[in-house]
């Protein structure tokens, strides 16, 4: 059975790295003749953490930290075998988590 669609989900803490990665994936897929939809920016997940500053008492003094997880979605319609091969050979940065589903 031939693959009719590839869905790629990207997650990263740095929005510049994820945008650069999405751009390279889209350029590679378009260069090989596939139809590309995206990158679609998905909602950013914000995790907030509150920590007591001092090691002893002073519970009134606290610090707040926030961790943003940026997400992008790319759909590749009618990928050719050349598209799949070029996506496998693509060199991607280490700070990006990639999920690939082929249907």
UniProtKB/Swiss-Prot annotation:
UniProt cross-references to PROSITE patterns, sorted A to Z: RIBOSOMAL_S10 (PS00361)
- State a GO cellular component annotated for this protein: ribosome
InterPro entries given for it? Ribosomal_uS10, Ribosomal_uS10_CS, Ribosomal_uS10_dom, Ribosomal_uS10_dom_sf
Which key words are in the record?
Ribonucleoprotein, Ribosomal protein
Under the GO molecular function aspect, what terms does this record hold? structural constituent of ribosome; tRNA binding
GO BP term (any one): translation
Question: Member of which family?
Answer: Belongs to the universal ribosomal protein uS10 family.
Quaternary state and interactors = Part of the 30S ribosomal subunit.
Instruction: Summarize the protein's role.
Output: Involved in the binding of tRNA to the ribosomes.
Know the name of this protein?
A: Small ribosomal subunit protein uS10
Query: What organism is recorded for this protein?
Result: Rubrobacter xylanophilus (strain DSM 9941 / JCM 11954 / NBRC 16129 / PRD-1)
Which gene holds the coding sequence for this protein?
Answer: rpsJ
């Amino acid at each position: 059975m031939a693959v009719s669609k590839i869905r790629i989900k990207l997650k990263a803490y740095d929005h510049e790295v994820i945008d650069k990665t999405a751009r390279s994936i889209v350029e590679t897929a378009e260069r090989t003749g596939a139809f590309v939809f995206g990158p679609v920016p998905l909602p950013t997940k914000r995790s907030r953490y509150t920590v007591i500053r001092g090691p002893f008492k002073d519970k009134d003094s606290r610090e707040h930290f926030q961790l943003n997880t940026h997400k992008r979605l790319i759909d590749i319609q009618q990928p050719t075998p050349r598209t799949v091969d070029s996506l496998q050979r693509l060199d991607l940065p280490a700070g990006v988590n990639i999920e690939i589903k082929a249907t």
